[in-house]
Amino acid sequence: LEFYTNVARYGNSILYRGYKNGHRFEDRVRFGPTLYQKDINGTATALDGERVSPILFDKMSQVKEREQQYGGIGAKEMYGNKNYVVQFLQEKFPDNIEFDRDVINVTSIDIETASDDGFPEPQLAEKEVTAICMKNNIDGIYYVWSCIEWSKQETILKHLNVVYEHCKDENELLVKFIGHWSSPIYCPDVVTGWNTRFFDIPYLVNRIAKLFGEDVAKRMSPWGLINERRITTMGREQQAYEITGIAQLDYLELFKKFGYSYGPQESYKLDHIAHVVLNERKLSYDEYTDLHSLYKNDPQKFIDYNIKDVELIDRLEDKMGLITLALTMAYRGGVNYSDTLGTTAIWDAILYRDLANRGVIVPPNGEKFKADYPGGYVKPPQVGMHEWVTSFDLNSLYPNIIVQWNMSPETVVEGERCSMNPDIALAEEHRNSHSEYALAANGVYFKKEKQGVLPKIIVDYYNERSIVKKKMLASQQEKENTDKSNEVEIIRIERDISRYENQQMAIKILLNSLYGALGNKYFRYFDLRVAEGITLTGQTVIRWAEKSVNQFMNKVCETKETDYVIAIDTDSVYVNFGDLVKKYVKPGTEVATIDKICEEQFLPMLEKSYARLYEMFDCYTPRMVMAREAIADRGIWTAKKRYILNVHNNEGVQYAEPKLKIMGIEAIKSSTPSACRDALKALFKVIVNGDEEQVQKAIATFKKYFSTLSPEQVSFPRGVNDITKWARKREGIYAKGTPIHVRGALLYNHHIKALGLQKKHELIQ
């Protein structure tokens, strides 16, 4: 088994690092790329239908020389993939890339620095490094270097295997660290931690360069290559370093990208996220005023604090598996691990690999014209409380629209367009007059003679995910049937389950991110007609469901023109079953009866309705499937995307006690104080299950409790960015019109400086 862990271009060479039969290797490969040019006699065909012929380059630099020779015109007309790393990987691994997660060295790191003058700036790296802790998944040992005393016998982390090296000074500490990091045994393939990309790694690189010179700092790269990057996030420019040969997968970034099942957070500090995910905290040092006091007065606890941070990262990965997920996605796309944190790069590689294996050449890449186009349809809700609400959801709306209408850049019919929009479609005033094409709701036609590249990949991914999920379920059943005392077999099965889970989750995430890539004007396959076609067709499809639902409900309930659809949100409809329940359902049987009506009448009606839509647009293949989601005895809407449902049954799962589904309400917003969120959730249960008197009593009780809480417990969690935009050095501290939370941050910084407290408290940036 051979696979890569990092591939980079250096001049005319490809620096290739990976594993072969369980052993790490590093190789420097001379690589000559292949690109293509238009040629009416060419033997190859590009995705856009052009005939092309290959241009074989001896080295990568020749491509740029050719572009300069033709003054940039040649670059625009050159077909093929100019991402040479991806091209190299496609040639090296044209098929599915298998990998062994267990041999890949994933190293977690955390550093501590002197903070007697306040929080240190990584770009300046003026303060000494006081402790470094590293732990890899290969030997499971926590390696720690520091100049203070620490005893293994006195640690509170006795369950961990710690190797502590006491150093005489910072120089020795950093020399030992570099020796460990750069050794063939311990050099990482992946380095992770919490905010390591913008703090730990740049601080180490800058500090080592300051003390020993840049050549020593470059030893952090197995190739001796480190490149500085300037990255602007939230209006603030930050320094990062690309360590050639080693992937940086900052767990903070991974959590923000893939940890969406936990929802938005009031804070993204490690202490808070560890509490949310693991119900654990960082090691508390509340008995000391700050980290510097802890370092000076309790060295034992200071090192324990350092080790604990690394352990928390390790435990987050054990539970969430986000690094394994990123690796799985990277090998699926044939890209470097860090490319999974974006959207367009991985999809560009996925499509390139698929087309290359079919002998189709990718078109040139370049910025396209992009005008504004409509998004998903959100219906203004019927505000207030509703009895017996049932929700229905279209399965993967946008990917399935792409498949049903065969939408892809190469299937767009050039020069053909009709006056079509969602309103015309819903009135059924216009039928597709070109049966050889599929008509989208923006009036664009798509060819049907063969499946487009985007629909093909979506279908392939869906089919593969279905197979993987079946394997995962089979393994879960195998685990249930296996003797629990057979630990070796249980571990094997759990590893299989984890692998399948990551595979299916990687496919799901990629499918969900495809539309985002298609709407990006820098994406090779961006086409405004396709992007607009997807969203306007999506609006039509969900409003078509609304029309069909209202026709059905008015007929069954013997009403006229009553709107039974309370709300619509892109791919979901929320239907008021209150009249139907009053008219036909026996008390006490509501949930079971609604479930039966949905299964036997509602869903078949929607299936027939979507078959009519399919015929009207002359689609490529039917893919619209609506499923029943929640049955709730009460629902409350306050505005678009803001509601509460008291759910009794969800997707066929019957709850012993109803569960609240809350969307957009302050009770789940990370900007609402935690104490208020908990109180609101409790209050909602009273609202849906009690009466006015009970609600007023609950509010009065909390109001009394609220007045006893500290300012920290009731203040609004708010993030700020680009605060320098509002700052004023003269004529006051902040500009007129400064938002209140930014004003607070500027006032805080002003008083910290005025009182000389920078050493104790970090400024808000």
Regions found by a protein language model. Give the residues of each.
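DnaQ-like (DEDDh/DEDDy) 3′-5′ exonuclease domain used for proofreading
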Residues: 1-187, 308, 312-331, 338-375, ...
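Catalytic palm subdomain of template-directed nucleic-acid polymerases
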Residues: 573-602
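C-terminal, non-catalytic extensions of nucleic-acid polymerases
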Residues: 599, 603-765
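Active-site-proximal helix-loop-helix substrate-binding element of RNase H-like nuclease domains
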Residues: 142-145, 152-155, 161-164, 168, ...
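Non-transmembrane amphipathic alpha-helical segments
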Residues: 458-479, 507
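Conserved catalytic palm subdomain of right-hand nucleotidyl-transferase polymerases, strongest
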Residues: 109, 249-250, 384-397, 465-468
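Common nucleic-acid-contacting/processivity interface regions adjacent to the catalytic cores
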Residues: 289-409, 415-416, 487-553, 567, ...
